[in-house]
Curated annotation (Swiss-Prot):
Taxonomic lineage of the native organism: Eukaryota, Viridiplantae, Streptophyta, Embryophyta, Tracheophyta
Function: Converts oxidosqualene to cycloartenol and 1% parkeol. Involved in plastid biogenesis. Essential for the male gametophyte function.
Reactions mediated catalytically: (S)-2,3-epoxysqualene = cycloartenol
PROSITE patterns, per the entry: TERPENE_SYNTHASES (PS01074)
Keyword Isomerase: yes
Keywords noted in UniProt: Isomerase, Repeat
UniProt cross-references to CDD domains, sorted A to Z: SQCY_1
Organism: Arabidopsis thaliana
Gene Ontology BP annotations: pentacyclic triterpenoid biosynthetic process; pollen development; thylakoid membrane organization
Protein's name according to its UniProt entry: Cycloartenol synthase
UniProt enzyme class: isomerase
């Protein structure tokens, strides 16, 4: 039976800054579990599989089953159900909150964070399996049980038409279909296995033009595997790393996720690396193409892309650029004396790869560059220490649920979820009853702050300061992020106001000052904050975005979410430390407020870039303005935002926004105008903060009624449609949102609407 392990090492090749706090990984133990436990797991798996085309999102039941066995669960309070004609009472809300918090406290890990699924994208696991296959480490790193669960996952998320999507809820794409078909083959499935599902997958690929129509990232992965030719790829010259930094196209000016993926890709392209040609690879050459492999027109293939994948079509300037590099520049760099420059570029690339690996304890900024960097380390030296240090960190990215084993979009969302959870629990005003939960969470926040900058000359490595920041996941990961720092700071400041007898010692003021320093340092000239770094180049750089599948990836843009979180954190900080860098804090807040107001859409909404979508963005937009004292009575911006939200409320009382809003940039309801507990909570939080209760409480009562009725028998909330997004077009799971935000919204509703009403 599988067991989730928390904050453990277990390998001499693991490095850590904080004794592995926040680390989460799954391990198989054949001796674990009673017959009843095993039956419960199998029932969860069967239920998911039977309903997989209706409910594509797993509910994280294996983790929940484990915690229900391990943690003492208090008797569940009676479930509350409210008729449409009934009034919502304070007692009903308090009972719902206690039921929700009683449950949520049972799935907290002993180190204080809430583990959970951060899967969703369907292109991550293939990169891992291709890399492990090439390096010969597949059977060393993954047990038979790992491989079995991965196959389960891939079959569970195959669409009815036989293909696979970019993410678990997406329609079939060539990128998803080819890579996941290849992954199943590398995991031991034959071309006709899976009760006909392999054949269905292959038919989808061939009926849509074959693997020559895969996206550029897919072409790269197939090329290193040996199932595609490098001449069928557009150039990714590593020489770009040798350009002077003042050029706007220097990779050091790009969004860190973009440059950190193209860094190892350029190394592999520069070397034209191809793995061992095995019998499976030779067979794939026959299975994936509509013509014999030796007859494929690789030059034509460079610019082919299936229409199903084309979110960001290449502009003409890009086609001209790639053709020039391919036909003129590359031939020069492949032979003497140009080869000397190529060798220098490759050395520069691997130097930067090692720096990234060492300063993330071999976790790396994300799963794509994690496996690419690992492959590059092996290509450089198959027996290297660097490659061995990479291997145990693979498990940090693997998550198991009833749908199988997936690769996550990060090594988790530990700090992010914990920061929100703390704010949600404090909003209920039930602090004393849940003191032990808050104390553990407080400890996690304190242990997860990044305490040092990366070593060396940060400019040389194109890195921003880190000291004082909070990361998205763990301190070992260590990349600083603006909104994670802000949410960590908000949580720390709120807890510092609670008696230390309940939540433990407050964080040292010096560390709070360092967090404020990070936030201020990340503000751009326009007042907005981007994610990891300052915006270092221009939006026109998207003209050379080679990734057909993703939008707005080349530079780090300022976002309403990051900017609003910074305002809220700095306002909270200023109340407690009014004298610290007063002028800079005031100016930062003022500029950020102007930025948020300037990017509001004409309909009153804000586009959310990191979750679905206008509901999420508008919650942040409103909260940023509310933090400086604006309400729907004194601010036309807030009033317009409230009008927008109220116009989207469903007859059920809730809100339900589809992920299609993200890619189309137009508000879309969920199918059948269904409501969603997370969207509903975001809308409620925005409206309550804006002062809706002073104007008309009815929409809030209706929303609260929907949330209360949605709560499950055990106090959990249901897992509904996917709610996270990145790069406009790819969805990602935030498993904790279904618990955090309904609790937060009902907490604020109880304290700021019902209790105020009673006074």
């Amino acid at each position: 039976m599988w067991k989730l392990k928390i904050a453990e090492g277990g390998s001499p090749w693991l490095r850590t800054t904080n004794n592995h706090v926040g680390r989460q990984f799954w391990e198989f133990d054949p001796n674990l579990g009673t017959p009843e436990d095993l039956a419960a797991v199998e029932e969860a798996r069967k239920s998911f599989s039977d309903n997989r085309f209706v409910q594509k999102h797993s509910a994280d039941l294996l983790m929940r089953l484990q915690f229900s066995r391990e943690n003492l669960i208090s008797p569940v309070l009676p479930q509350v159900k409210i008729e449409d004609t009934d009034d919502v009472t304070e007692e009903m809300v308090e009972t719902t909150l206690k039921r929700g918090l009683d449950f949520y406290s049972t799935i907290q890990a002993h180190d204080g964070h809430w583990p959970g699924d951060y899967g969703g994208p369907m292109f991550l696991l293939p990169g891992l399996i291709i890399t492990l296959s090439i390096t010969g480490a597949l059977n060393t790193v993954l047990s038979e049980q790992h491989k079995q669960e991965m196959r389960r996952y891939l079959y569970n998320h195959q669409n009815e038409d036989g293909g696979w999507g970019l993410h678990i809820e997406g329609p079939s794409t060539m990128f998803g279909s080819v890579l996941n078909y290849v992954t199943l083959r590398l995991l031991g499935e034959g071309p006709n296995d899976g009760d006909g599902d392999m054949e269905k997958g292959r038919d989808w690929i061939l009926n849509h033009g074959g693997a020559t129509n895969i996206t550029s990232w897919g072409k790269m992965w197939l090329s290193v595997l040996g199932a595609f030719e490098w001449s069928g790829n557009n150039p990714l010259p590593p020489e770009i790393w040798l350009l002077p930094y003042f050029l706007p196209i220097h990779p050091g000016r790009m969004w860190c996720h973009c440059r950190m993926v193209y860094l190892p890709m350029s190394y592999l392209y520069g070397k034209r690396f191809v793995g061992p040609i095995t019998s499976t690879v030779l067979s794939l050459r026959k299975e994936l193409f509509t013509v014999p492999y030796h007859e494929v027109n690789w030059n034509e293939a460079r610019n082919l892309c299936a229409k199903e994948d084309l979110y960001y079509p290449h502009p003409l300037v890009q086609d001209i650029l790639w053709a020039s590099l391919h036909k003129i520049v590359e031939p020069v760099l492949m032979r003497w004396p140009g080869a000397n420059l190529r060798e220098k570029a490759i050395r520069t690339a691997i130097e930067h790869i090692h720096y990234e690996d060492e300063n993330t304890r071999y976790i790396c900024i994300g799963p794509v560059n994690k496996v690419l960097n690992m492959l590059c380390c092996w290509v450089e030296d198959p027996n290297s220490e660097a490659f061995k240090l990479h291997l145990p960190r693979i498990h940090d990215f693997l998550w198991l649920a009833e749908d199988g084993m997936k690769m996550q979009g990060y090594n988790g969302s530990q700090l992010w979820d914990t920061g929100f959870a703390i704010q949600a629990i404090l909003a209920t005003n039930l602090v004393e009853e849940y003191g032990p939960v808050l104390e553990k969470a407080h400890s996690f926040v304190k242990n997860s702050q990044v305490l040092e900058d990366c070593p060396g000359d940060l400019n040389y490595w194109y890195r921003h300061i880190s000291k004082g920041a909070w990361p998205f996941s763990t301190a070992d990961h260590g990349w600083p992020i603006s909104d994670c720092t802000a949410e960590g700071l908000k949580a720390a400041l709120l807890l510092s106001k609670v008696p230390k007898a309940i939540v433990g010692e407050p964080i040292d003021a010096k560390r709070l000052y360092e967090a404020v320093n990070v936030i201020i340092s990340l503000q751009n000239a326009d007042g907005g904050l981007a994610t990891y770094e300052l915006t270092r180049s221009y939006p026109w750089l998207e003209l050379i975005n080679p990734a057909e599948t993703f939008g707005d990836i080349v530079i780090d843009y300022p976002y309403v979410e990051c900017t609003s979180a910074a305002i809220q954190a700095l306002i909270s900080f200023r109340k407690l430390y009014p004298g610290h860098r007063k002028k800079e804090v005031d100016e930062c807040i003022e500029k950020a407020v102007k930025f948020i107001e300037s990017i509001q859409a004409a309909d009153g909404s804000w586009y959310g870039s990191w979750a679905v979508c206008f509901t999420y963005g508008t919650w942040f937009g409103v909260k940023g303005l509310v933090a400086v004292g604006k309400t729907l009575k004194n601010s036309p911006h807030v009033a317009k935002a409230c009008e927008f939200l109220l116009s989207k409320q469903q007859p059920s009382g809730g809100w339900g926004e589809s992920y299609l809003s993200c890619q189309d940039k137009v508000y879309s309801n969920l199918d059948g105008n269904r409501s969603h507990v997370v969207n509903t909570a975001w809308a409620m939080l925005a409206l309550i903060g804006a002062g809706q209760a002073e104007v008309d409480r009815k929409p809030l009562h209706r929303a609260a009624r929907y949330l209360i009725n949605a709560q499950m028998e055990n106090g959990d909330f249901p897992q509904q449609e996917i709610m996270g997004v990145f790069n406009r077009n790819c969805m990602i799971t935030y498993a904790a949102y279904r618990n955090i935000f309904p609790i937060w919204a009902l907490g604020e509703y109880r304290c700021q609407v019902l209790l105020q009403q009673g006074e």
